[in-house]
Swiss-Prot record:
It comes from Pseudomonas syringae pv. tomato (strain ATCC BAA-871 / DC3000). InterPro entries: AstB_sf (IPR037031), SuccinylArg_d-Hdrlase_AstB (IPR007079). Homodimer. This is N-succinylarginine dihydrolase. The gene is astB. Gene3D superfamilies: Succinylarginine dihydrolase. Catalyzes the hydrolysis of N(2)-succinylarginine into N(2)-succinylornithine, ammonia and CO(2).
Length: 448
């Protein structure tokens, strides 16, 4: 039976704004308080989805969250009607309103960790929603994330869903942004690579000094257990604390993997050779052969990697066995990075082509092509069991672009978040979206 990897891209929500909420994310902090353009952001994301679909890749879409999150504001003591809750939050504690309006759920690489059926003990695709407990504005996402994923992958015969891990620092889990799967073929058993930034309970592990390590070893181990993964198909690697302190807040900012290829920066990991040896050994036993493509710091610095998001790219397998690298246009604007990419293609290695996309609205908030997608490897039977409403087609693309044009503003400042009309606009848009994507009731305002 044939299998493929499906990229489910996050649809940017109507409240996309530059709140500067993500300490440790250089782009997020440096663009704080600028005016954003939610309409442009959503259309840029949809254009990437359409382009990949046109290239022959199976492409899906993942719905945004309800924002402003009035229910979360009520939990924090704001009372009255929904409009009064927003007005009080704006007057008494504007940072909380900004956090409750974040459109960060567009970066669905953090939505969950996914293990395909070829790796799991019960032969089902397993999903664990990420608790994202390091940042308040993201920690409130996982209940809706779980409902949306449940509506997309509803058939319990093929799909298993786990709630987020306990929302405490010891089990900080950032989802697929710190998880890569290596395999000879998507339908065969592979090796799942979990990258962590620190250990919560074992002081022998190093930790960053400036910025937080968002993923713990304990969280990664818990997800592997929940998914029924054997020790033979799991490798744990530690991210270099020094690069976390340079703004590499997730592993997908310094490395990307697909198939048998790991594309990574020389400074990405601790104990790199030992880690690569374990990956090679376990992948070999699964029938694959690891190809490690290391980018030397002498050619691309960590600073250039963070500025350009070279590694926050999509590495996609083409039918002829070669690979395509999807990068943001910031890579083209960086002479060191673009020079390296030209040499990479010329070297006749696994990466045969680079395609550039304009994702400026997302990039300015700290998220590139890889942040915007959740990868799910599916066989033909499983793909047929996915809610068809979330699989991108030419008609769906047209419907969604028209939906964005109808409902999204072209300018969003901090003051706009306090506009009581914004709540009505967003709920109207999302209510229509759940009908377009055939999700049913997934948002708090639809459930209450």
């Amino acid at each position: 039976m044939k299998s493929c990897e499906v990229n489910f891209d996050g649809l940017v929500g109507p409240t996309h704004n530059y709140g500067g909420l993500s300490y440790g994310n250089v782009a997020s902090q440096s663009n704080s308080q600028q005016c954003s353009n939610p309409r442009e952001a959503a259309l840029q994301g949809l254009a990437k989805m359409k382009a990949l679909m046109d290239m022959g890749f199976t492409q899906g879409v993942l719905a945004p969250q309800e924002r402003p999150d009035v229910a979360s504001l009520r939990q924090l003591g704001f009372t009255g009607s929904d409009e009064q809750v927003i007005e009080k939050a704006a007057r008494q504690d504007m940072p909380l309103l900004v956090a409750s309006c974040s459109a960060s759920s567009m970066w669905v690489a953090n939505a969950a960790t996914v293990s395909p059926s070829a790796d799991t003990a019960d032969g089902r695709v397993h999903f664990t929603a990420a608790n994202l407990n390091c940042k308040y504005h993201r920690s409130i996402e996982h209940p809706t994330t779980s409902r949306v994923l449940g509506a997309m992958f509803a058939d319990a015969k093929h799909f298993a869903h786990h709630p987020a891990l306990p929302s405490v620092a010891q089990f900080g889990d950032e989802g697929a942004a710190n998880h890569t799967r290596f395999c000879q073929d998507y339908g065969q058993a592979g090796v799942e690579f979990f990258v962590f930034g620190r250990s919560a309970f074992d002081t022998r592990y190093a930790a960053p000094q400036k910025y937080p390590a968002r993923q713990t070893l304990e969280a990664s181990r818990a997800v592997a257990r929940l998914h029924g993964l054997s020790d033979e198909c799991v490798v744990y690697g530690q991210q270099n604390p020094a690069v976390i302190d340079q703004g590499v807040f997730h592993n997908d900012v310094i490395a990307v993997g697909n198939g048998e290829v790991l594309f990574y920066h020389e400074d990405a990991f601790l104990h790199t050779e030992q880690m690569l040896g374990e990956l090679r050994d376990k992948l070999s036993r699964a029938g694959g052969q690891l190809q490690a493509v290391c980018v030397p710091r002498a050619e691309v610095s960590v600073q250039d990697a963070v500025r350009s998001y070279l590694f926050n790219s999509q590495l996609l397998s083409r039918p002829d066995g070669s690979m395509l690298l999807i990068v943001p246009q910031e890579c083209q604007a960086n002479a060191n990075v673009w020079g390296y990419l030209q040499r990479l293609i010329a070297d006749a290695g696994p990466v045969a082509e680079v395609k550039v996309f304009d994702l400026k609205q997302s990039m300015q908030n700290g998220g590139g092509p890889a942040c915007l997608r959740l990868r799910v490897a599916l066989n033909e039977t499983e793909l047929a069991a996915v809610n068809p409403g979330v699989i991108m087609t030419a008609p769906l693309y047209e419907t969604l672009t028209q939906w964005v044009d109808r409902h999204y503003r072209d300018r969003m400042s901090e003051n706009d978040l306090a506009d009581p009309r914004l709540l009505t606009e967003c709920r109207t848009a999302l209510d229509e979206l759940t009908q377009i994507l055939k999700l049913g009731a997934v948002y708090p305002f639809q459930l209450n």
